[in-house]
Amino acid sequence: MALSSSSHLLPFSRPPATFPRARHAGGGRGRAGATGRFIACSSPPPPDVVVTRERGKNAKLIAALEKHNVQSLELPLIKHVEGPDTDRLSAVLRDEKFDWITITSPEAAAVFLEGWKAAGNPKVRIAVVGAGTERVFDEVIQYNDGSLEVAFSPSKAMGKFLASELPRTTETTCKVLYPASAKAGHEIQNGLSNRGFEVTRLNTYTTVSVQDVDPLILKPALSAPVVAVASPSALRAWLNLASQVDNWGNAIACIGETTASAAKKFGLKSIYYPTTPGLDGWVESILEALRAHGQSKEAPGC
């Protein structure tokens, strides 16, 4: 699917169609409920985009889309729960010293901070992936005594760039603690290990699919021309729901390349993602997907 030459988005090209062309939004107006809500100026029109992050974490995206007169349906598809190593984190921080702590997502940052505080705020140096992850540490950095320092972020907000660019701080063994989702791949730890780092990975949280999806919310969600996803886990959860209809084939707008690659592996065709992960690029990806599906948006009138 070609984009204009001025676009910075990188959609996967559309091969001969195995899915029908995306349907425009329509067919049903969902009521507000426990698992989703419309965001609109007055009575809710059919949604333009379904936003799928964990409950409480969609507000910034919804607000950014509202500026473009894009109607969002909030349908949280995943939630974060404790991982098998959650309880070990504070003890490891107390008992061992690391040259780097690598944090790759806002959720990993939030879980790490809980363990770090429980360990008595030991001195740590953090490497982060993404501006959103770094922002989780802002308040702590502002008020702590310098024991926590965010000292590195890679040139591109992706795990493979962190693995290839993280600087060594010693000529001898350089120790890295990697608190991660239990569902995260091994790209970072393998990449660092191949460069001679000694990596300790702790699976401090994981994601599970939300089970109680209101059918009255799901119906308009399945008709929306674009679904926005921020992780392979959310994508899998959406595809499980979309399997209830024949040949669902509307657009997927991914927060970054990792999720987009997962979408391609699942056989989806209409996939959009920004070159640099983050909110602004994600919004542009959603707008590009809407334009491609004949849903061009103007500034809101209310």
UniProtKB/Swiss-Prot annotation:
Pathway where this protein functions: Porphyrin-containing compound metabolism; protoporphyrin-IX biosynthesis; coproporphyrinogen-III from 5-aminolevulinate: step 3/4
Catalysed reactions, semicolon-separated: hydroxymethylbilane = uroporphyrinogen III + H2O
EC number(s) given by UniProt: 4.2.1.75
A GO molecular-function annotation: uroporphyrinogen-III synthase activity
GO cellular component term of the entry, any: chloroplast
Chain segments carrying region Disordered: 1-39
Enzyme kind, highest EC tier: lyase
GO biological process: chlorophyll biosynthetic process; protoporphyrinogen IX biosynthetic process; uroporphyrinogen III biosynthetic process
Boundaries of the annotated transit peptide in chain numbering: 1-50
Family from the record: Belongs to the uroporphyrinogen-III synthase family.
Function: Catalyzes cyclization of the linear tetrapyrrole, hydroxymethylbilane, to the macrocyclic uroporphyrinogen III, a precursor of tetrapyrroles such as chlorophyll, heme and phycobilins.
Name of the protein in its database record: Uroporphyrinogen-III synthase, chloroplastic
Organism: Oryza sativa subsp. japonica
Gene: UROS
